[in-house]
């Protein structure tokens, strides 16, 4: 008998420290007016010095257990998507597993930058459809603030910290299947390589690429990609499911920049009321943004929802779901 994947619970968490635009304007060449005009962002949340990615992810995992009524021992897999892990090793997912006492679960991290939640959902779906795993957590968590160069306004004003996640469960009822279709892609030739957080781990990386421990992005290129290539992927996936954009209850995009979301909405000829967003309050929380926005509207879902995200790699993915 075939096994299907049902999305049964969502959770989200942001750390308590709120940073508004004026606070950033006090330490870099920017202003509240400039940030809001170019990004739509008003505030973002930053983790405390002793608060790590695993701490945020653990908060979400505990919410998923509470909402589902499952014991931690019932979890088979914990998959954490992040580009700000607590360490290179062990996986942040392993720390979450220990924190919640999910002794029967195996755990690993997935790195697909801001596309992590869509890649994570698609990956978890395959584990469940194998018939061997019943209860899977996919948690996207980031502490981007610890990776910022606060002299670089082209990056620092965008990012915030947060976590969101989903509980996926096996079902033999095809009517309960939540993951309808997916399209995941990468363009490695568009990658900007730098040594980043791992520092120059090879002589080639140390010699040939820009040296920085902070995030680095080419904003104009990302904007162009996100507003042209990504909508093409979205349209193709919608058509493959024999739907039209107007059939969607919601479209939840990567929370990179409100202006990008507005351009995608115009491209699909859909009103912004169909685009739940949190970027204005939380900033770009990387892979967590889509999960957090979905968590906000999860209890209201009655129709199909398109999730789409894009990030470094370039990695980009769209997943069509229903509750």
Swiss-Prot record:
Intracellular or extracellular location(s): Cytoplasm
Q: Give the enzyme's main class according to its UniProt record, as a single word.
A: transferase
Q: Which residues form the active site?
A: 114, 254, 284
By its UniProt entry, which InterPro entries does this protein fall under?
A: ACP_syn_III_C, ACP_syn_III_N, FabH, Thiolase-like
Record's Pfam families? ACP_syn_III (PF08545), ACP_syn_III_C (PF08541)
Q: Which domain of life is it from?
A: Bacteria
Keyword check for Lipid biosynthesis, yes or no.
Answer: yes
Tell me a GO cellular component.
cytoplasm
**What is a biological process (GO) this protein takes part in?**
secondary metabolite biosynthetic process
**Region listing for ACP-binding, in residue ranges:** 255-259
Quote the pathway field: Lipid metabolism; fatty acid biosynthesis
Q: Please give the catalytic activity noted in the UniProt record.
A: malonyl-[ACP] + acetyl-CoA + H(+) = 3-oxobutanoyl-[ACP] + CO2 + CoA
Q: What is known about what this protein does?
A: Catalyzes the condensation reaction of fatty acid synthesis by the addition to an acyl acceptor of two carbons from malonyl-ACP. Catalyzes the first condensation reaction which initiates fatty acid synthesis and may therefore play a role in governing the total rate of fatty acid production. Possesses both acetoacetyl-ACP synthase and acetyl transacylase activities. Its substrate specificity determines the biosynthesis of branched-chain and/or straight-chain of fatty acids.
* Family to which the UniProt record says this protein belongs: Belongs to the thiolase-like superfamily. FabH family.
| Domain comment (free text) | The last Arg residue of the ACP-binding site is essential for the weak association between ACP/AcpP and FabH.
Subunit organization: Homodimer.
By what name is this protein known?
A: Beta-ketoacyl-[acyl-carrier-protein] synthase III 1
Which organism was this protein described from?
Answer: Lactiplantibacillus plantarum (strain ATCC BAA-793 / NCIMB 8826 / WCFS1)
Taxonomic lineage of this organism?
A: Bacteria, Bacillati, Bacillota, Bacilli, Lactobacillales
Task: Give the encoding gene's name.
Answer: fabH1
